[in-house]
From Swiss-Prot:
GO CC annotations, alphabetized: cytoplasm; extracellular region; nucleus
GO annotation (BP), single: positive regulation of DNA binding
Family: Belongs to the thioredoxin family.
Organism: Canis lupus familiaris (Dog)
UniProt function note: Participates in various redox reactions through the reversible oxidation of its active center dithiol to a disulfide and catalyzes dithiol-disulfide exchange reactions. Plays a role in the reversible S-nitrosylation of cysteine residues in target proteins, and thereby contributes to the response to intracellular nitric oxide. Nitrosylates the active site Cys of CASP3 in response to nitric oxide (NO), and thereby inhibits caspase-3 activity.
Keywords: Acetylation, Activator, Cytoplasm, Electron transport, Nucleus, Redox-active center, Secreted, Transcription, Transcription regulation, Transport
Residue(s) carrying N6-succinyllysine: K8
Signal peptide as annotated in the record: none
Gene expressing this chain: TXN
Protein name: Thioredoxin
Residue list for modification N6-acetyllysine: K3
Length: 21
């Protein structure tokens, strides 16, 4: 469960980074 949350967080961060760029 924790791994899933971490993955979701990393995915959202990547999306945010891509949107920022």
């Amino acid at each position: 469960m924790v791994k899933q949350i971490e993955f979701k967080y990393a995915f959202q961060e990547a999306l945010n980074s891509a949107g920022d760029k």
